[in-house]
């Protein structure tokens, strides 16, 4: 298994993680402002983990108000190499039931509705490949671990 430092971004309803030890809340300043909340560092199953409640503790930030750049920058600043983002969502497909786990391999980036959807600009020009935005290795680990835990994946 990889030794990458893991970042967890919790969506609606995920504010605490069972088994998270050595917890310490850390305030991280970024060039893009403050992230949604302080970041919680600690250990989970022996791994270094950084947790961020996406909407802030108390669910006080609307999805359209999220500072995605600050959230990602803060994770990177704390040494995170992989981010697992958890969301409570629905589906129009009946094959997916409540509590099923869906591990995506592609997504539609709707943050482009915002004027601040990139880390570049102000004299910095870059083109980032987006054909495979999900790490294949991380996806395999998530699927394997979820199935081993008895989840419907």
Label the predicted regions.
Residues 133-153:
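Active-site rim beta-loop-alpha module in soluble metabolic enzymes
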Residues 1-130:
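Metabolite-binding pocket within alpha/beta catalytic cores that recognizes anionic/polar moieties
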